[in-house]
């Protein structure tokens, strides 16, 4: 029994050590072959990016990742270059880590609580942007319906299956939507990829991005960008360079 307890302790310790406590700009590895999942291997919550030369701290940007299948070896890599791009604005940047296997509505509530806490602890902020991709775009869109504070929030939802998606668990509500009604305190933009160019959507019978946004804007991204297909993950970079 002691042998098994020792093995369990070592396993738990190794798992704990894989969660990074810092989030530093100069530790983000842009080359895919060198990527070590530094961005994603951390506790749930909102993490501030360190090492940014901030010249304006009155507003900032929160980024929200998507879903990762089991065994995916480069979790979070699609966000590295976009986050570096956002850091050039010289404003505070945060990364929102959540359990992508949890129900999206629960993750939206969690984002609400964490954002509320962030605002409370940073009284110098007068506005925030939140950029969500894929499942993160669903989470931020559900958040955009719920936000009831006077504090202004700008939401950018990128390549998100807003019309419907599989349940994340037996207790999760099945998302089947035709419409999102955005809160009056939120400025909302949906960025849609061209379905045929999006590896996550192109083989589906319908485009899960097709919904009506009541109180927001919906924009279709170009098919190509810099002589390459503008697909599911590259769409983040396009938006971060063009907003």
Segment roles from a protein language model:
Residues 61, 69, 91-93, 101, ...:
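Serine-dependent carboxylesterase/thioesterase catalytic core
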Residues 175-243:
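C-terminal catalytic-base region of ester-bond hydrolases, centering on the histidine
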Residues 75-76, 167-170, 200-205:
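Short aromatic-enriched loop/helix-cap "lid" or pocket-rim segments at secondary-structure transitions
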